[in-house]
Each structure stands twice: as structure tokens, then as C-alpha cells.
From Swiss-Prot:
Originating species: Mus musculus
Disulfide bridge positions per record: none
Effect in UniProt of substituting L126Q: In wobbly mutant; destabilization of the elongator complex and reduced tRNA wobble base modification leading to protein misfolding and aggregation in Purkinje neurons (PN), PN degeneration, microgliosis triggered by the NLPR3 inflammasome and an ataxia-like phenotype
Protein's name according to its UniProt entry: Elongator complex protein 6
Recorded metabolic or biological pathway in which this protein acts: tRNA modification; 5-methoxycarbonylmethyl-2-thiouridine-tRNA biosynthesis
InterPro entries tied to this protein: ELP6 (IPR018627), P-loop_NTPase (IPR027417)
Oligomeric and partner information: Component of the elongator complex which consists of ELP1, ELP2, ELP3, ELP4, ELP5 and ELP6.
Disruption phenotype: Early embryonic lethality.
Any single Gene Ontology cellular-component annotation: cytosol
Family note: Belongs to the ELP6 family.
Cellular localization per UniProt: Cytoplasm; Nucleus
Lineage: Eukaryota, Metazoa, Chordata, Craniata, Vertebrata
Keywords: Cytoplasm, Nucleus, tRNA processing
Gene this chain is encoded by: Elp6
CDD domains named in the record: Elp6
Origin superkingdom: Eukaryota
Length: 266
């Protein structure tokens, strides 16, 4: 995890909110550093994590995780992390016969966009057994990233329904958290992605939007991050609070600073 980002969000692994949906989105830049932050953050917070990884392999996330001080292999072995590797699983679904329903069964059912099997997998993974006391604080669902589902032929409405069920189960019933990344196809005519992004924005308690610089590439400033808190339970004046910072990604950290305040230009 990145300590400076924790400071901006006023949170630590020992002090976290429960029952929240966090939306990560990136526009004209790579926002995967946010996924790595929240993955390592919740593992360090001793949460049970179900990670639906549709973009990269387990080894990729594990290598980055080690740089951030967590071992995904160890977390998986002790049952804290359940990792659904989309790249590997999709090959199994498409080219091998399955005796039982697979979380990515919708790949075989072209045109249906039915994510029921994926939701059932998440539900079974995160729901504690009735007779057991969970050693973990609370459950967390992390998805990287939802835009991939659209590219695989699932409709935006089906993805929104899926996320609504996940939020009802994880956030409301189990008092856990959901974190999901969505690409923002800014300027492109992609109605499905816009529908998904707008729908999730209205449901989210926290939105982190990473975007490239309008002026183009800069060696010392890699992009800017907008943070929007949405607190429905607060008074009207406190419901929405927004901050924007610029950032630079380093090998094992990300540094944040106010616009135009990069150490390289001061």
C-alpha cells in the first residue's frame, strides 16, 4: 500500500470503514497502481479478500505485492486471499469440458450476459460458515476490471445488476467492502462503458479517478488523481467533498502533491 494515499484518504489498516463501495477509474492513463494499493491495504488489514482479476496473472500481482510488503502466495495459502485468475480460467472454460458450473461460465453462453455463476462464486467465497468464527476482520471484493466484462460481450445493465447484488451481499449483509476498477473511455463513443461508469458512480461512497495530464507526458508528474467522497448519511453540505492531486509513480511508492507543486519544478 502507499502511505501517502492512506494519508489523503485519512485511513490506515487499523482504522477502516465498512460497508462501502469504492470506484476506481482511469482515463488516458494506467490506474492499476490503485488496485495494487487496495489489495495490499486490505491484506494488511487482515480482511478476507476475493480478488476477481480479469487483466493480469497471479504472478504479476504477487511481484508487485512483494514490493508493497505483502505476499499473495502466503495470503492464498492461509485462506485469506481467494484469487480468480481470469486469463487462466477463461482458457479452461472455453477449451475444456466442465462438470460443474464455472465462475466464468458466461464465456460459454454467448449473448446471455448471465453473471449468476460469478456472483455465486463470490458469495460462497466470502460468506463465513455458520459454525465457524472467521479469523478475518470482514470480507472484501476486489475486481480488476469491470470494463473487461463489457469487451467480452456482457451488457452494461447486466454488469450493473451484478454489482448491485455484490454490494447488497458484501456491503449490506456482510458489512464488508467492494472495490472495482473501470476504464473511462473519455471522448470515445462507448455508450455501454459510460452507462456502467455513471451507474456505479451513483452507488459509490468513494471515487478515485486517475487521469493523464492534459499537457501530455512529463517525466516528474505521471498524472493527476481526483478523490470524491460521497456520504449520503451526512448533511447536504458534507455529502460530497472533492480533492485533486498530481502524482509520480516510483518503484515501491507513489508520491502525491498539489497541482504545480512537484519537487522537480520548485
Amino acid at each position: 500500500m502507499f502511505p501517502e494515499l492512506n494519508n489523503l484518504l485519512s485511513t490506515t489498516p487499523d482504522k477502516t470503514e465498512q460497508g462501502t463501495l469504492t470506484l476506481l477509474c482511469d482515463a488516458k492513463t494506467d490506474g492499476s497502481f490503485l488496485v495494487h494499493h487496495f489489495l495490499s491495504f486490505y491484506l494488511k488489514a487482515n480482511c478476507k479478500v476475493c480478488f476477481v482479476a480479469l487483466v493480469q496473472s497471479f504472478s504479476h500481482y504477487n511481484i508487485v505485492g512483494q514490493k508493497l510488503g505483502v505476499s499473495l502466495t502466503a495470503a492464498r495459502d492461509r485462506g485469506q486471499l481467494v484469487f480468480l485468475e481470469g486469463l487462466k480460467s477463461s482458457v479452461e472454460v472455453l477449451f475444456h469440458s466442465q462438470d460443474e458450473p464455472h465462475p466464468l461460465q458466461f464465456l460459454r453462453e454467448a449473448g446471455t450476459g448471465n453473471l449468476q455463476s460469478l456472483y455465486t462464486f463470490i458469495q460462497d467465497t466470502l460468506k463465513p460458515a455458520d459454525s465457524e468464527e472467521s479469523p478475518w476482520k470482514y470480507p472484501v471484493l476486489l475486481v480488476d476490471n469491470l470494463s473487461v466484462l463489457l469487451s467480452l460481450g456482457v451488457g452494461a445493465v447486466a454488469v450493473l445488476d451484478f454489482m448491485q447484488y455484490c454490494r447488497a451481499t458484501v456491503c449490506c449483509e456482510l458489512k464488508g467492502n467492494v472495490v472495482a476498477l473501470v476504464h473511462d473511455t473519455e471522448g470515445a463513443t462507448d455508450e455501454g462503458n459510460d452507462t456502467l461508469l455513471n451507474g456505479l458512480s451513483h452507488q459509490s461512497h468513494l471515487i478515485l479517478r486517475a487521469e493523464g495530464l492534459a499537457t501530455g507526458f512529463c517525466k516528474d508528474v505521471h498524472g493527476q488523481l481526483s478523490i470524491l467522497w460521497r456520504r449520503p448519511s451526512r448533511s447536504t453540505a458534507q455529502r460530497a467533498q472533492s480533492l485533486t492531486y498530481q502524482y509520480k509513480i516510483q518503484d515501491k511508492n507513489v508520491s502525491f502533491f498539489a497541482k504545480g507543486m512537484s519537487p522537480a519544478v520548485l
